[in-house]
Amino acid sequence: MKKVFYLLLSLVITSCVATKNKVAIKNQDGDLVGIATRNDFKKEPFASQWFNDYYEYYQTDPETVTQLKQKLNGITIKGFMGTWCGDSQREIPNFYKLLDESDFDFKKLELVTVNRKKQANGLEKGYNITHVPTFIFYKEGKELGRFVEHANENGTIEGDILKIVSEIPYKHPYQK
């Protein structure tokens, strides 16, 4: 009986450690690495350095947001960003504000924070992340497209995302 208890205890501890490695934690440079949520960015130093101001001052396009409310149904998003990256610091708060105004279900968003080598304890593997931020949009498990680093064709993040989720041909800035 003791052996079974210790075996179960070791399995529980092992699974907790495995899960812990995926949650975003600060590395030696002070950057988050792992799976992050908005709450991570609302803490210091990120809140006062960039998140709160960008979120507050970003003005979305109301007409595009109205269209996105319908188009985002059934969409899941996998995002990659670096807390060290100026483009990520600009786009992540804007992205959250856009999703808030579009009534997006945040259970369908997974955001991975990467280090300066664009690595996150293996969470980035298989996604070919070359620039951050990168948002990958999926419908029924199929990739529809990616928003990479900055707005491209439409001049705003919401314009580019609307094009992607509307399944209109779209190329991000680094796509040939």
Question: Where are these predicted regions, by residue range?
Answer:
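Bacterial Sec-dependent N-terminal signal peptides
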Residues: 1-25
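N-terminal leader/targeting and pre-domain segments
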Residues: 20-72
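Conserved helix-turn-beta segment immediately C-terminal to the redox Cys motif
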Residues: 69-77, 94-111
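Thiol-based oxidoreductase modules, predominantly thioredoxin-like and allied folds used
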Residues: 79-82, 106-120
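Conserved redox-active cysteine motifs that mediate thiol-disulfide chemistry
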Residues: 83-91
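Structural alpha/beta surface segment adjacent to cysteine/selenocysteine redox centers
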Residues: 120-132
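Non-catalytic, surface beta->alpha helical segment in thiol-disulfide oxidoreductase systems
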Residues: 137-173
